């Protein structure tokens, strides 16, 4: 694993400014003439703003949520359906937590299923996040699980058996028409095993653990500048 810094000088940056810095830093991975996989959330929104400056140089994007699709279109970037695309060079998205093995918790914005699908197609996953998202052990951030509505209670009982405290995210319906259970109290020592166990529960669409397919590059916004970590 390689780490390098791009310093931003002595200026004290807010959390949003750190997110903006990594969003724009991700442009270095965008190749002209390609279709770019784009994530969801406040940090990904900064990347979309940056991508708008290259709209004449790329073919377009594949989006992980309706919200990102609307933002991309508002900037004049063509949005492809994933079914129209054979492969993606990169997928750029944020994270709610990321550990030292480049495994992540994602899904705070309820777009985890589409995010996971697009990440699986991309050759390279670029994670963009501010330093507050770096953790030693995943699980302090509630783990999102997308669930078929009729299975909500049954899935919740199984999540309790795995050591969690599931909480129904009231009023949230995913772009796929499903619901979210946020699982509190997890100390995820083996993220791959936990991802596989939760995904095996009938009624689960997917869990917001990105352990089997983690990030290849992490751009981390810190007070000292953008830190690049390459797996």
Curated annotation (Swiss-Prot):
UniProt KW Membrane keyword: no
Enzyme Commission designation: 5.3.1.6
Pathway(s) where this gene product acts: Carbohydrate degradation; pentose phosphate pathway; D-ribose 5-phosphate from D-ribulose 5-phosphate (non-oxidative stage): step 1/1
Superkingdom, taxonomy of origin: Bacteria
Binding-site residues for substrate, renumbered to this chain: 40-43, 93-96, 106-109, 133
Reactions it catalyzes: aldehydo-D-ribose 5-phosphate = D-ribulose 5-phosphate
Keywords, sorted A to Z: Isomerase
Signal sequence interval, chain numbering: none
GO CC terms of this entry: cytosol
Statement: the UniProt record of this protein carries the keyword Isomerase: yes
GO molecular function (one): ribose-5-phosphate isomerase activity
Subunit structure of this chain's protein: Homodimer.
Family: Belongs to the ribose 5-phosphate isomerase family.
NCBIfam families according to UniProt: PRK00702.1, rpiA
Name this protein carries in UniProt: Ribose-5-phosphate isomerase A
Species, as recorded: Escherichia coli O1:K1 / APEC
Taxonomic placement: Bacteria, Pseudomonadati, Pseudomonadota, Gammaproteobacteria, Enterobacterales
Name of the gene: rpiA
